[in-house]
């Protein structure tokens, strides 16, 4: 397999990654490299290897030589391109950002020539459909297909899809899980399939049936506050208790109100509260996440937000896709990933995006009936405990795009984007984000919720003992527990001499023993049983 005049690409290093020796880049990455398309290389690069077996890693898709697309120098460019596209659709799935840029690289006549190679073939029809769906234009000279079976636009074995609608012109079922203005995709991976098979939603229902309703309500109240504080902490804020409690109440209502742009603006007002230094609503200027140079004030972006002129279209697409996913049987965590992480990348507001992004996770899980109505799912608390992974996942999309966004500094040290970037925010690969969110879901059900329920059970048992022996006021019992927690089960000398001076030494020993029995000798870690 030699270098040709077309798309095969050999290099020891490619897009900042070291490649295994003697391997040839094919598919999407090879086309992007050859044509110079202004988009990042896909997360996983397809390679033809001297080996005899397929092997998939987080970075590479390795295929034996028998899988190589025909890229013979005798072929013209369009025919070689078609062969690589067939390979890509068959093994890499649909890449909407790629097809959007490919459709603007070639003129309509060249694209029609591409489709005409096998006008009734399933891959040709899928390519044709994607081009016309993305451009909104009909390719010249291509007649409607007839007397053929319908084929799926997206292979559901490779990526998560929706039920779909028929496109009679192409004889293609459009099962893309989104709209033209917002359609992130998620690949099916072994990790995601494993998570889905664990069926957390059903196991949750069975587990919670074993607890008193009163205990669940109290746990939900504590978890609301915990999640609210965690969401602020993720943003580096330490809100007063009242503010955290108000946002916690809002989280508790997730799924009860329809998701609209106006609803998101209402949530922003609840998050920010004070309009003195900023305007509520969609941004009217550029935006970025990052720092400023301490001397010049120049922006140092880690993420560049969508252009203000694109926000209305992007948000309409996001809302419409949210409604589509709500009604479709697509997995709830995958749906939450697409809408919530899509929102935070768009970054439609000047401030409050992060907390609203995490609210959207709650909303989608609630409307998809993954989380139980009235019982909070404290996903922010788990995210806070996994901040390094969270930041890595977010940077996975943002960082590669920085090389393809042209911008200039504004007089107020903001960013003004100069090129067309809307596709970067509507056609994303959110596979790592779905895996991360599933990890947080698992952690929440395996650790955070059980710890809270175990703690409240222990507290109630300890309180019953104190009530039966000392008839102590509830507020004083709460204070006693606080002191014992701080003292690792021992009451401090100060507490003995001041707040609990009425207790005798033998009574204190009994209390400490009862505390240890309930709080210190029980594991607070619980795992969902099969």
Task: Name each model-derived stretch.
Residues 1-350, 355-530:
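FIC/Doc superfamily catalytic core
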